[in-house]
A protein has these predicted regions:
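S-adenosylmethionine/decaboxylated-SAM
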Residues: 2-6, 88-258
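Membrane-proximal basic amphipathic "stem/tether" segments
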Residues: 1-66, 70-73
Length: 258
């Protein structure tokens, strides 16, 4: 951690637990060599490519019977406005990801309690809340820690309109502080979307927490599983065969059903 990041954390007392964790890791845990990280990414990408299946196969396997349409077609005005807001945001925080999948899975599950980690502009939050609004039920709990030194605090979830926020609990804390709070209140959840700490350590911790809270039949979805072997290792540990779906830009999404 550099000095500027340290000062940034000092101005945010709610993030002190994360500051202490990072300082502790910097003192006790050797930094993983870049060569190791690159090797892990190659191995993971190869595994993803070898296990990938079309979206249609996944939908058939889980018994999806609804009409598949893009969220941008179902809610064109909301989607267009969200794009304008994200486009005018001075901080770049990533794209929309596999939002259509999230939307339709919420409807398929008739989800009542959904948890996501990582919000950024709020694209995934938006589609989940649109699905909950369509059903007239349910709540989304989202966890997100602002990027250090990026000044993005005020833009977290910016694409989510006010009329959808009644069903939304946004907790602006790191996963290790926010998820225990959420899961104490919700011991059982229907759907979990992981898109925050991409390190192997962070994913292993988050997957374990979310999986333990999922109800039987619920789904754990993780973006960018090609980055490292964390998703593969976790799926083997719990002895579940995952669905691996190709995503935009050569990425992969992993899905596990409890």
């Amino acid at each position: 951690m550099n000095f500027r990041s340290f000062v940034w954390f000092l101005g945010r007392p709610a993030l002190y637990p994360e500051l202490f964790r990072r300082l502790g890791r910097s003192l006790t845990t050797p930094r993983t060599p870049r060569s190791h990280r690159e090797k892990q990414k190659i191995l993971s990408a190869d595994w993803c490519a070898g296990n990938a299946c079309p979206r249609e196969d996944f939908l058939r396997d889980v018994g999806f019977q609804g009409e598949w349409r893009k969220v941008s077609e179902i809610h064109p005005d909301i989607w267009r406005r969200a794009g304008e807001i994200a486009g005018s945001c001075p901080v770049r925080m990533g794209g929309a990801g596999e939002v259509d999948l999230l939307y339709h899975l919420c409807l398929h599950l008739q989800a009542d309690r959904v948890v996501e980690t990582g919000v950024a502009h709020g694209w995934s939050s938006l589609v989940i809340l649109l699905a909950l609004d369509r059903m007239g039920r349910g709540t989304l709990a989202s966890t997100d820690m602002p990027y250090a030194l990026r000044r993005n605090d005020r833009y977290i979830g910016c694409v989510v309109p006010e009329n959808l926020r009644d069903r939304w609990k946004l907790i602006r804390l790191p996963d290790r502080d926010a998820l225990p709070k959420v899961l104490r209140e919700w011991p059982a959840i229907d759907l979990a979307h992981y898109d925050s700490d991409k390190s192997e350590r962070g994913r292993a911790w988050g997957y374990r927490r979310l999986w333990s809270a999922l109800r039987p039949g619920g789904f754990l979805i993780s973006d960018d599983i090609h980055d490292n072997l964390a998703f593969r290792v976790f799926s083997e540990k719990i002895r579940r065969k995952p669905w691996v779906l190709p995503a935009r830009g050569g990425a992969y999404v992993g899905i596990l059903k409890k």
